């Protein structure tokens, strides 16, 4: 046969052409298949766009320490979460200052399910490239353990690892994995060398586990230390039915879940996801939480403003059709004092809201305006501050600028003392809501609007 081909160069050329055409056809078919898949974000968190000067409601972030081989600034796995098991700055362990030849396994709680999955990583706030040596995803069993047989190795553009330049987002290649609604996934990332201060979301309501070396494929993390932050992980997408879509909750620490029970999935966005999943007419709807502690509509202080992060945290999320906007309390408390050096007015905030609404509508996304919850009892709350909150809420309720409104203020305020939270809804600081308060917020949302 070989000797025959040598005598017939035309046959060789034809074979090459047919091979190229076949390969191109396969590649084209694969790209068409991938393009036909309907991706929806089942979980997300807001990673910072740049280094920030404050965390939460004030105070500097943990200072980066020199690179160390051991696990820096983390707690042993046996350490219980926070005071009374509640999320928030009190008892919140510092974010690791660096990782080096270590694996971090993070837990995410899904909203909707699907048959294929991919992750998004962010190196947005770093000064140096991030090297990911290995990445895995699996169904989580308990603590750091994964369900046997569910572990999947992730690749990036066909490669087992990747280098993510500063400011860059990276999507993994899709893998087949049956993801159930309202389930826990474990995402494991191995970093082979010193990362420097990691891009992170520093209020994770699930414990993350850190071990020495590449333990991404281990069913249980060996001798882990813990933290409660999401490092580099910014989203998990699943393939879903054509009618599936996501709701983005854009907000501050109230949305982020500060004040709720660790490991409980009891922030209002998780409760809303359970309400939607329980009804066949809405079980195709995902809820993703893009809350940031201390976030403001207008100013970059604790993270960049809602206006600055809207494109990344809302418009770029897979399958988004609705956004629930609960912001402004930090603008009001921090800059609403009558003698503020950098004052904010209700008109300023309304102008910011109008910008967010216009940008969402440009992309076919509907906006629910959420009234600002009461903060009476906080020492910063003066009559002038309260007047701004009331003015903003009145505009949200009556302006018809939004596609729908949810009156969180009315749902959680004390009827006898309407400037304050109901006692059972107050986590203790007169700003953040308890588990019961978050339930009350989720119950106030008319889910019928999402069926329109």
Could you say what each language-model-derived stretch is?
Residues 2-4, 12-15, 19, 25-250, ...:
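N-terminal secretory targeting modules
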Residues 353-361:
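Surface-exposed amphipathic alpha-helices with a cationic face
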Residues 197-203, 258-265, 298-302, 335-338, ...:
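Short, solvent-exposed loop/turn and secondary-structure capping segments
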Residues 307, 333-335, 372-452:
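Catalytic His-Asp segment of secreted/periplasmic serine-dependent ester chemistry enzymes
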Residues 260, 292-347:
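Oxyanion-hole/transition-state-stabilizing segment in secreted/luminal serine hydrolases
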Residues 125, 193-194, 253-257, 292-297, ...:
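Solvent-exposed loop/turn segments at secondary-structure junctions
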Residues 256, 264-296, 304-308, 313:
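Phosphate-binding active sites in nucleotide-utilizing proteins
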Residues 246-251, 255, 285-291, 321-326, ...:
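Structural recognition of the beta-strand scaffold that forms the well-ordered cores
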């Amino acid at each position: 046969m070989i000797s025959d081909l040598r005598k017939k160069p035309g046959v060789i050329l034809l074979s090459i052409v047919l091979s190229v055409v076949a390969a191109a056809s396969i590649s084209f078919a694969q790209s068409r298949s991938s393009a036909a898949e309907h991706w929806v974000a089942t979980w997300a968190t807001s990673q910072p766009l740049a280094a920030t000067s404050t965390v939460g409601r004030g105070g500097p972030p943990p200072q980066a320490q020199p690179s160390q081989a051991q696990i820096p600034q983390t707690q042993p796995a046996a350490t219980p979460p926070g005071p009374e098991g509640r999320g928030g700055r009190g008892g919140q362990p510092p974010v690791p200052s660096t990782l080096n030849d270590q694996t971090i396994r993070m837990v995410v709680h899904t909203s909707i399910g699907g048959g294929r999955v991919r992750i998004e990583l962010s190196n947005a706030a770093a000064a140096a490239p991030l090297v990911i040596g290995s990445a895995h995803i699996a169904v989580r069993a308990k603590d750091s353990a994964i369900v046997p047989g569910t572990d999947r190795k992730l690749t990036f553009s066909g490669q087992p690892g990747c280098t993510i330049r500063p400011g860059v987002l990276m999507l993994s290649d899709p893998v087949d994995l049956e993801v159930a609604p309202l389930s826990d996934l474990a995402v494991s990332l191995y970093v082979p060398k010193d990362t420097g201060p990691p891009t992170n979301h520093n209020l994770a309501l699930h414990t993350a586990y850190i071990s020495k070396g590449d333990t991404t494929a281990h069913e249980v993390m060996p001798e882990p230390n813990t933290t409660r932050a999401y490092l580099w992980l910014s989203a998990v997408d699943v393939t879903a039915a054509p009618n599936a879509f996501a709701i983005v909750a854009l907000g501050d620490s109230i949305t982020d879940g500060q004040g709720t029970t660790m490991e409980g999935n009891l922030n209002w966005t998780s409760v809303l996801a359970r309400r939607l999943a329980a009804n066949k007419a809405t079980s195709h709807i995902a809820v993703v939480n893009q809350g940031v502690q201390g976030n403001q509509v207008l100013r970059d202080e604790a993270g960049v403003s809602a206006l600055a992060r809207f494109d990344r945290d809302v418009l770029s999320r897979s399958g988004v059709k609705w956004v629930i906007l609960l912001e402004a309390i930090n603008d009001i408390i921090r800059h609403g004092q009558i003698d503020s050096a950098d004052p904010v007015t209700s008109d300023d905030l309304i102008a910011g809201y109008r910008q967010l609404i216009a940008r969402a509508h440009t992309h076919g996304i509907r906006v629910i305006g959420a009234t600002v919850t009461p903060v009476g009892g906080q020492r910063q709350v003066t009559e002038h501050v309260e007047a701004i909150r009331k003015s903003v809420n009145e505009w949200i309720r009556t302006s018809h600028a939004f596609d729908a409104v949810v009156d969180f203020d009315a749902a959680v305020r004390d009827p006898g003392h309407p400037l304050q939270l109901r006692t059972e809804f107050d986590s203790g600081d007169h700003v953040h809501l308890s588990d019961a308060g978050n339930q009350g917020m989720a119950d106030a949302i008319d889910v019928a609007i999402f069926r329109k």
